[in-house]
Each structure stands twice: as C-alpha cells, then as structure tokens.
Amino acid sequence: MSAPPVRIRDLHYAVGARPIFAGVDIDVPQGQITAVMGPSGTGKTTLLRLLTGQAAADRGRIELFGESVGELDKARLYALRRRTGMLFQNGALLTDLTVFENVAFPVRAHARLPESVLRRLVLTKLEAVGLRGAAELMPSQLSGGMARRVALARAIVMDPELLIYDEPFVGLDPISMGVIVRLIRELNETLGVTSIVVSHDVEELATIAHRSYLLSEGRVVAAGTPEELARSGKPVVRQFMSGAADGPVPFHFPAGDLAADILGRAQQDKLPRGRL
C-alpha cells in the first residue's frame, strides 16, 4: 500500500514557551476530503504552515507525498508546493489584476504556454467555479463569495494533487457558503484530488468530509467520520460538536475569587495616592 499524500507523526511545535502541538498524528488518505477542526487558537492554520514548509517543527515528522518536509532543500520544497493548491483564508487576490490575470498568475510564473492555451485553461477553471463571465472584472468589483471562488480557480489552475482550504467558510453568507461546500465536493470528485479542509464550521464539514480530526490543547482528541465524532461521548468533543458555551473549554478566563478581587480593589481605592 502506498503512503498517504500527507502523514504527520508525533508533531511537536511551540511558540516561545507556549506549546501549540504536543504529539499530533494525522493521516490524509488519497482522494478523500479530510477535515481538521478545533476551537479558535488551537493552531489549525499553524498546522498548514508546518505542512507546507513555511515553519519548521520542533520534533516529529511531516511527510508530503512521501517526502519529509523538514529534510527538504528549497528547490525540492518548491517542487512539492507546485503539486499543492491552497485556498487562503482571506482569498489573497492581487488587487491590481483582473479576475482572469489572477487565475493566470501561477501559470505565467511556472510555465510558458501560448496565450491561446493559457486562455483556454484559465477560462475552463473559471467555468468550473461558475465565474467565466466575470473574467474581466477587478477584485474590488467582487463580493466576498465571488472572490473566494476566484481564489479557488487559481488554486486549481495548475491541476494540483492536493488541495488545502484554510477556513474557506469564514465571512460568507449562507448562499456563498453553500456554493463553496458544493465546489469542494465537486472538485474533489471530478479532479480526483486529495483535500484538507481546516475549519471550525461543524455543520458544513459534516456534509463533505470523509474523515475528521478534532484538535484541542495541542493534541488530536478525536478522529473518525463526522458521524462518529457526532456520537462521541468525550466531553470536549461533545462541547465542540454541539457548540456549548461552557464545558472543558471554559466560559470564564482563569481568575481569582470575585469577592476578594472586588474587595481588594475597593481597599486600594481608599488609600491615599502616595501610598499606592
């Protein structure tokens, strides 16, 4: 059996004294949509930076297409990135280029194609996301949902083997969100790619993911199909899946006794300013 496109083993990573990951294991099967979920601040986007070599792990191993990301030189890492398409959280469109030229940008940077071939390629990708008619518009003329779709067309223009989505549903209205969900599913099926979707939108992911991982406090606390996670008896998993305001992830930030805190402040206010 061949190795999965993405394999993460015993991943450790910290920012200063703050641990972000402490022994994370993840497998992303070929041709499937894998969801990576977790509360805000759990390091989901950081995980993508580590996966694509934008940051280096403190310990552990990250394999992309069977190669250890941490052991690659710049040239080899660059070659692997060309096999990967990424939809950034903010879309990251170039504001001074038309929709057409935004999608064409990676092709112009990495390949030398006749203009007729390039045009056919770009228009085909825009057609796939429903925006061929918007090819000559500027990014400032697009809605948030349209901009996200243009960015997706750009992500697939080089026919990647792996598609990575970083919070693809953030800031979208229900219709635009439904469009993105549909596109993720359809592109995965028609292009035969492997997809990683990083998000905390449980309902949307449940409709498209083959397998889900839930991160919390630096570890994978649950892994399985969306249905298996929904049936989990683990308190932290149940809280996240149901959206409960309090639980293992507490409502209150850690603090001392309220009465003592108020009383202490009141006593300080009574002291002459020179004695504070």
Regions found by a protein language model. Name each.
Residues T52:
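Helix-to-loop junction immediately C-terminal to a conserved catalytic motif
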Residues M138-L142, M146:
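Conserved ABC ATPase signature
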Residues D159:
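Conserved catalytic motifs of ABC-family nucleotide-binding domains
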Residues M37-P39:
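The feature captures the beta-strand-to-loop junction immediately N-terminal to the Walker
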Residues E67-S68, E115-G133:
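Conserved ABC ATPase "signature" region
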Residues L163-D166:
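Catalytic Walker B motif of ABC-type/P-loop ATPase nucleotide-binding domains
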